[in-house]
């Protein structure tokens, strides 16, 4: 690398000649009132920091300290730490940071170098702080404590010290490890610090808006970044305290609490934070790492957490760092750009530059280089050399081996010496070795790094007295008194001699494994110690562990201690603080500590909290609420409206339930009668949207409405919280549902004739299914349980859910309760015991209370740990502070309320909430309205709360929602909680109805209680206005269970449901660009109603709503269902108009597009470029802007003018004219395309295949992973320069003609040597390139035939003979330096027009041919279509390729397609990224919306990062409910003979119109030759079909080797497993065993299962293997698994196809059928119009009638059998008959009324065909058709149309 190259052009005089003090003075003058340092609860402003440090400096000067003197700082991490540093510097002195924890010997070595004048120490801590440590500093100099100096500072005048500080003055001296056993003091001067800080301000960039974390010790060079970078630019330093340093979670809390935006850390610390669960923080935008190598894996994880990640490089001797590299995912991590005034050289032993690509030693020169080593001229002379390339400068010999990969990229590849870096600390092995050999018993020592652990190999002196003492016991204390802790080896290994190499040096690789030398003591066999041993073994990587071994002495360190913490917390289910792990560092101590903690917890629960309630856990946030209650209440908002308006929701018993008059009797003793005629009923309780949850009508009829009510309510709860199926499925979300009395009445079931529901009724009515059905339907994997606690059930469920969250059993939970009243059983029972209300109304605490009114309903809340909810920005409705559950014990009777029990449960809840009775404002009482229960409850409340009430606090207010909605039993407790949360939100307490006269049985005055007889404002407490509102909720069960919960008002910042900004709340402000408003549903009608609900919401919103919040929430918090629309609008008026159009006119047809897009990305070539292309995108999207800037920097060295100055120049300007030059145009096109791809990629859009036109193919190759970005840029630059250098006598013309016509014309003009075909763009458009005069003649030739031609605006002939061999050689030279990488995406080559084979584009020769040969774009488009591409996204400045591509694929191509999904050009989609006639962002946003409509998964959260928006509450899904429950059921207890109960029959269910489905499609599987070895795992070596398989493998270049077990094939390309078994169970067992073996072995070659007849004809055993394999590929994604089915006899042709399939790694499932290879493809089919088929009915096909069902089955071999009729029918008639049969039998399995309700294209699983239905269908279809079908019928054929197609092929003998 030539030292004068562009890499080293870093001169910047503005950053030179400064000192720290003067720069700080400038900063503090500007930012005096701003916070400079935040430490714990202390904040120091810039003004205060300047004033205090001035006083300290003046004090030091008065004590004789002056310029050039040295002051040692041995300080703890107190808030004044930085002030003391600045004070020393302002006095002109130099400071030496001393870690107070260092051993005395080390401190002595450091301070011996110095002529110390003063040592400043922290006062000795009484709490175990470092204080003055173990060293007597008074032996070296005058010693003062910080407190002494601060006392004296008070008497100093407030003035600036008059000291003339020079840039060359030494600011501080840092000591690092030395090779002789003595540390080296590195002298860093002021100018170096200032140049460094000013450089970082520029790159990576630090501003006065940043808050920078300071966590390093000041003796570590990274502290220079954390202190000086922020303080010299006006930023705020957030200083971590000592207890924060070791605990990553404490650091994470610190970052969150103080809104840190910027931090620097070693990779080790960052790994520890990630392992502790850190995933970034809002506002934390920049992360800098250094001190050790940053791995690509860690870099990738970090870039997912932070907007920018930078890697810094630089030794301590060069002031922290000398270069910065911005980390990009997928790119190498290099040294980066040198700092200003810094140069980097890679030199050989003669100090001469080495060539690019060669290795040398890295030397660093410039303003940051230290002055040398303190008082060590020999070492200084060896390491700090005069710079021969830069006069007057010194260069530092770094010891790092480095290599310039090209002129701008520099990488470190190793060390030239033995220096070691472990967890960011630099260690010279000689330093440690010298300290070891200083021991009298040690003759020699070698120290090495093994797996990030220091190992010392030692030879003892013979005959020493310590021979029996273990080496570690002898040396560890010795070294701990002499070396820092990080330099003490983890392992000490005693050897007799050191192994040597041939040249006599120690052979480090031959030294023994240190683990093998450890002899651990036996671990006792207790469960806990064995569990600890397993965890330590896993983390340390070895099992040589004894009970008393220190974790840190057997390989543990600060990074691995975090892994221990994580695993322990998972094991124990409770927090384990990191400091405790440092304190208890042996298995014995740790086991004792953990056991004590467990016992302490148990004792506390038994003695202090007998109710067993959590008193120490984290608060729980209620992040969503949902309900379905009497009075047509479907939302919490409707509940609040009913409560505040005083609505009475009680009605007479609906006739569809039972005849209240028929069972009425005023006598409570009348058997089978009830005196109660009313209650709280949910009008539509029996209605349900079964299709939404994938439940068939047949199953839905057998499901208790309690299950369907709670299922829909839980869904709405999650949806209101902003969580859809994508985030819920597979999550650790718990489900806790409360229930009470069974909904199901045996009499009703018997009357309904339930035999037709057998198989569904058990689950449909089981209480356990209440929770299980919710978890199953939503895919939740946390703890799931149904709790029966009577009327207390939902509050008990909430209590259990909170406990599960606190114990870490789940991350989120839904708690709910539900009751359904289908029969009068409870009315009769409660009438007999005289607690039922005659009219169904509850009158809580009223003088005329007459019993409870029974009701029904569902309520649910979604819960999270409060910290998690705040982290995730969830909307918090309320905070559950604590809860408790108990039982009243043995009282007067089981049903009598227990006053003592109620008091105990309230007090336990208060204890759990860490609150006192006076903290509670209101109690939502159980309040059923019984004459016994209400006084008992009031008395219990009075005893708990009355003593805490006074004239200031006022009485405790109580009320009950049962007065409005009756007693909803299992749902009641949560209904009360929801009421209280709403009351907190509205700061209003609703009245309790029917309570004009409070009960005289209650002492209201003495008990200091107040019944809310009217609505009352909930005002802040007089004695504490800042206290949040708090309330308790009572809920008691009839069997004696008591529950109480205490909830608290959330902070307003987390409870603002509106989400509107305070400074921008105009909900009809016009936006700069239209925003997308996403709506979706399962059906078109649901989608229309969804639009109606949104329209109503926006119209009736009481608070103004920002459109950006609406758009964001619709996109990111809603599940996106199959039918989709996107409405684009810029203001509310426009959005409302578009919604009205949907409401009035219905959903457009595009919403029903059920075809999933297969995306191909097209990268355009030169000629499409234009001025300002992409500039509009850069202004709006950060990813695009950063990518463009980054790539433009890579082109800087090869272009005369900065690329962006040309790309984004004003049109017609001089700079813009440069775009007409190829050397600018091609880099510009490439830059734009890669930035567009990164933008698409950031939004989650991934292409299935890519294609590039001309230079666009380089961008496509980069996207496909074939070359990295830097290499691609070099290739583009070379190509552009080459083509710009072409003769200007060339020309190009676009002709309206086919390639044969143009070729013929060239021949006729005798111009074959002067003109070439440059591009075949479409079948009828060809571009010719060549000599200008010939091009003109060619144009005239076609114009004479009335064919259009267009001379292109270029004076050069691209892709022609003008590119001669000499010019192409230049391109080849560059291409040969490219390091090609493994292809990650399919790419179509425009050199061949075909799909590129692996490695085809990975050669210089290819790219030379690509520049010269014609562009076969038209053929490439055909290949894309053959690959199933149906959605084409162009990445370029215009829509050129889309237009040409549409011409290529014009017409219906489905006849010739080889791949599924092609339905002709009319179904293809062409999308643009940019369009010159439209706003840049608008074009790409519209295209993104189109992809969403076509089911492409979009990361909408990423899209809105640049737009903004907050999560707000929006309307939930528009359920399409229908009546199912026991269809045909009549009310019992009825004297009336009227028939059907009201409601729709299932035949009113919506009819789906289409669905994505799987079909088998032929692909091209041409035989390919490749050298490889394949193992054959065969059932029998003499199987008749083995011979052709082996022969075909040999012909294809694949060596077959018979193996007996998988292990023999580990080194082969793969193994073919052939299956044959007579037993299905035996086959599945063996298959599962094999998969487990493959997983356990981490088997990397391909495992290909070969079955025979598993698909189609239905070999039952082998068909089952397909299901096993499909499950395995999901379960073991890391394995290479495939399956192939061979139909019919295996011959050489079949075997050859099998060999071809082995080369097609992208097809996991294939079927060989004769000469064809079939693969499954997703496709969309329109619904077939066939006649209804039902069993025992007639099938009408083309006017003919044939019997079906039982009649046909009676004579299966007769001429009238259905089987014979379909075999005799023609193809079209047969297809109709089979479709009708499948449709009818599917209708029967589903239980729908007519076959017309079956959508032939909707998946069996989607509509609810379960395993029972599939078995019945297979049985009936086989009986009707004579076709043997596979056992896994509905998996092989996922929908009716694919099943009927398969039947037809089987019948036709295919």
UniProtKB/Swiss-Prot annotation:
Pathway: Secondary metabolite biosynthesis
CDD domains for the chain: A_NRPS, PKS
Residue span(s) of domain Ketosynthase family 3 (KS3): 617-1049
Biased composition (Low complexity): 1537-1555
GO process annotations (BP): fatty acid biosynthetic process; methylation
Active site, per annotation: 791, 926, 967
Residues covered by region (Disordered): 1536-1556
Keywords, comma-separated and alphabetical: Ligase, Methyltransferase, Multifunctional enzyme, Phosphopantetheine, Phosphoprotein, Transferase
Gene Ontology MF terms: fatty acid synthase activity; ligase activity; methyltransferase activity; phosphopantetheine binding
UniProt domain Carrier: residue ranges: 523-598, 1776-1851
A Pfam entry, by short name: KAsynt_C_assoc
Keyword Transferase assigned: yes
Source taxon at top rank: Eukaryota
Gene3D superfamilies reported in the protein's UniProt record: 3.30.300.30, 3.30.70.3290, 3.40.47.10, 3.40.50.980, ACP-like, Luciferase, Domain 3, Malonyl-Coenzyme A Acyl Carrier Protein, domain 2, NAD(P)-binding Rossmann-like Domain
Alphabetized InterPro entries for the sequence: AA_adenyl_dom, Ac_transferase_dom_sf, ACP-like_sf, Acyl_transferase_dom, Acyl_Trfase/lysoPLipase, AMP-bd_C, AMP-bd_C_sf, AMP-binding_CS
Modification O-(pantetheine 4'-phosphoryl)serine, positions: 558, 1811
Role: PKS-NRPS hybrid synthetase; part of the gene cluster that mediates the biosynthesis of pyrophen and campyrone B, which represent a class of fungal amino acid-derived alpha-pyrone natural products. The first step of pyrophen biosynthesis is catalyzed by the PKS-NRPS hybrid synthetase ATPKS that uptakes and condensates L-phenylalanine and malonyl-CoA in order to produce desmethyldesacetylpyrophen.
Domain comment, as recorded: The architecture of ATPKS is the following one: adenylation (A), phosphopantetheine-binding/thiolation (T), beta-ketoacyl synthase (KS), malonyl-CoA:ACP transacylase (MAT), ketoreductase (KR) domain, and thioester reductase (TE) domains.
Family that this chain belongs to: In the C-terminal section; belongs to the NRP synthetase family.
Protein name: PKS-NRPS hybrid synthetase ATPKS
